[in-house]
Amino acid sequence: MPELSRLVAAPSVVNIGHGTLNTLSDILADPALCPGSRIVVIAGKNSSQEVTAQLRELVPDATWVTAENGTEEAAQILATELRTTGFDLVIGVGGGRILDIAKFVAAANQWPSIAIATNLAHDGLASPVSILDAQTGRTSVGVTPPVAVIVDLDLLKSTPPAMLSAGIGDILSNISAIA
C-alpha cells in the first residue's frame, strides 16, 4: 500500500496544435465526454468573430450566452438561469475570466464542460478552481475541471503580443511549480 496517494482530477482530452478546434466534433460524439446534445456555449462579448463563426458551424444547435461580468454573483445568476433550461454540456470559449465562469456554471449544475482557449494568459485552463470577483476581492471556487481542453494554435495568431508574453510566463511558472 502506498505511503502517500493522491487522486488528481484532470481533463480526459487535451488537444493542443494547429486546427485542433476541428477535434470538437469527435469530442462531442463521445458519450463518455458529452452525455447529450443540449449544449450551451459561454463566450465573452469580445470573442473573436473567427472563433465564433467556426464554433457555430461545429455546434449549430447550441445555445449561445454572452458572459459580460466575471463576478461570483453574476456567475451564480447565470448558473441558475441555465439550470431552468437544462443542458448536457457547457462549452467555454475565451480567456481566463470566461473559462472560469463556464467551469463555475457547469459545476453548479453538475454538467461537464469543455474549455476552448483563445489566449494563453490563463494558468487555470484545466484546473479544478474558478477565480471570480467577489465583494471582498477575488474568490477561488472549487469546480470540476473540464472534460476536454482545446488550444488551437491557429486561433492564437491574432493574440496581442502582451497577452502572448503573459501566456508564456504562465506556462513557464506552471512548469517550474510542478518540477
Where are these regions (language model features)?
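Glycine-centered flexibility sites
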Residues: 17, 25, 94-96, 167-169
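A glycine/threonine-rich phosphate-anchoring loop and its flanking beta-alpha core
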Residues: 12, 108-179
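ATP/NTP phosphate-donor binding region
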Residues: 1-89
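Glycine-/small-residue-rich active-site loops that bind phosphorylated ligands and cofactors
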Residues: 47, 69-70, 97, 120, ...
